[in-house]
């Protein structure tokens, strides 16, 4: 799972979710600022380079996306600077182009990850579409 969580509020909002994934044994990757935050709060996160940093490096996020190293990408925009928008766009576009699930909202990401980590298949009752109407 790769996190690029943007502003401090988003980092805090995603902390419990990233802890859950880490506790379940998932490998956590994150862009530099997010990785530093997660590591400082007990989540072992491997830093990855932004798209415009060291493009040929093994741990450049775009190379890792192309190599399908992530099963989920959580990318929360931080600000509207040209660099931030371009890098964020490239990550989101790469996720879509390589069929990697992408979440761009911190609250939605937290809810999804909590459900993913806490619910078992036996907890979910499968119904036909008509039963939901």
Feature-to-residue mapping (PLM):
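Intrinsically disordered, low-complexity linkers and terminal regions
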Residues: 117-124, 130
